[in-house]
From Swiss-Prot:
It is an enzyme of class 2 (transferase). Its EC number is 2.3.1.46. GO terms for biological process: homoserine metabolic process; methionine biosynthetic process. Homodimer. InterPro entries: AB_hydrolase_1, AB_hydrolase_fold, HAT_MetX-like. The keyword Cytoplasm applies. It is found in: Cytoplasm. Pathway: Amino-acid biosynthesis; L-methionine biosynthesis via de novo pathway; O-succinyl-L-homoserine from L-homoserine: step 1/1. This is Homoserine O-succinyltransferase. The active site is at S175, D344, H377.
Length: 415
């Protein structure tokens, strides 16, 4: 059993380098999604069934002949299948975890075959509320089934089946993605060799559920929401979605980070420095939040926001075991890496420590890193050398165990 590693300068797993010398760090290149169609009905936790659906995916690297080098990356609330590389449709669209995944990066695509999946209900190509309901010929809208993290895992498992992957070398994710990785380890233990959970939690606190509820109410009470059927009305509940994003964005940053970025800096103050005594933008932080909200409302779907935040609320694997997290995690056979960040108040380090304690109680191999970083919850997306050293070291250990001592020849992957 691996002992927990707290605030490491370098992780113990990085001590012995893999024999092969990887190529220089680089981009995963120009990438485009593939759309997989699944006609087998998918039973959902709600009791409903989704009769056929599509999932948008992207892949990076090459699947080896033994199909043992696959890594599934699960995305957070507003992300997608576009994990790394540059979108073929937009050269400015770089993958949301491009600093983590690619040639020579912590998750080295010279060795690993990485899959990014856009979850059901999302708005980046997979079947969701904006998709056409075959029963009506109109967008699903509010009629789209409510989903859970476990529903996403069942759908993702079919992607693994599509590629003939019996067992992932690792399933990983940050935030909501970490919940999916944890769910994989519990619900499909035989299919996960390693589970990497970053800046996540085994359940939402009352405060977090409260934030989600306020965000949802902002959307639902927008006059342009039309009960979720705004597509038919040619409207977008942009005001509500913008406010929802502003609320969420505050929770992703630490107080210190916001103080350093904005402080009480004024936005175009009067010549004499006086306040304007009105309700338009007065401070830089207000301008920033408005910009983030308005930008988000132009590309994200409001019904998707409702679905995903409710899936967050419902995630609680210990609910089935009377609140005993160790019992809930007992089916897991994977090795675990957990990473938390000191200033993350959305999913604070104590939630990761709680998972570590439960796993150790079960005798599961666990490596834990608690990174002292000022950036709050969003630190999991940033290029922090200490954080990346932990992840790199862990994946190098996996590579040694799997005998991935050299780059996998790019012979093409199954479509």
């Amino acid at each position: 059993m691996t002992s927990p590693v707290l605030n490491p300068a370098l992780p113990a797993t990085a001590a012995a380098p893999v024999a092969a010398t990887p190529s220089a760090v680089g981009s995963a290149g120009i990438v485009a999604p593939v759309f997989l169609r699944f006609d087998e009905p998918l039973p959902l936790a709600s009791g409903q069934t989704l009769n056929g659906y599509e999932l948008a995916i992207e892949t990076y690297g090459t699947l080896n002949a033994q199909r043992t080098n696959a890594v599934l990356v699960c995305h957070a609330l507003n992300a997608s299948h576009h994990v790394a590389g540059v979108s073929a449709d937009n050269p400015k669209d770089v993958g949301w975890w491009d600093n983590m995944v690619g040639p020579g990066k912590p998750v080295d695509t010279n060795r690993y075959f990485v899959i990014g999946v856009n979850n059901l209900g999302s708005c980046f190509g997979s079947t969701g509320p904006a998709s056409i309901n075959p029963a009506t010929g109109r967008p699903w809208g509010a009629a789209f089934p409510v989903l859970t993290v476990e529903d996403w895992v069942r759908a993702q498992a079919r992607v693994a089946d599509h590629f003939g992957i019996e067992r992932f070398a690792a399933v990983m994710g940050g935030s909501l993605g970490g919940m999916q990785a944890l769910s994989w380890a519990i619900t499909c233990p035989q299919r996960v060799a390693n589970c990497v959970v970053v800046a996540s939690t085994p359940r939402l606190s009352a405060q977090n559920i409260g934030f989600n509820e306020v965000a949802r109410r902002a959307i639902i009470t927008d006059p342009d929401f039309h009960g979720g059927d705004y597509y038919a009305h040619g409207t977008v509940p942009g005001r509500g979605l913008s406010v929802a994003r502003m609320i969420g964005h505050i929770t992703y940053l630490s107080d210190d980070d916001m103080a350093e970025k904005f402080g009480r800096t004024r936005r175009e103050p009067a010549a004499d420095g006086a306040y304007r005594y009105g309700y338009d933008v007065e401070f830089e932080v207000e301008s920033y939040l408005r910009y983030q909200g308005e930008k988000f409302s132009r590309y994200f779907d409001a019904n998707t926001y409702l679905l995903i935040t409710r899936a967050l609320d419902y995630f609680d694997p210990a609910r089935a075991t009377g609140g005993d997290l160790a019992r809930a995690l007992a089916p897991a056979t994977a090795d675990f890496l957990l990473v938390s960040f000191s200033t993350d108040w959305r999913f604070p380090p104590e939630r990761s420590r709680e998972m570590v304690r439960a796993l150790l109680k079960n005798g599961s191999p666990v490596t834990y890193a608690e990174i002292d970083a000022p950036h709050g919850h969003d630190a999991f997306l940033l290029d922090d050398a200490r954080y990346h050293a932990v992840v790199r070291g862990y994946y190098e250990r996996i590579a040694r165990e799997l005998g991935l001592n050299g780059a996998v020849a790019p012979e093409g992957n199954p479509a």
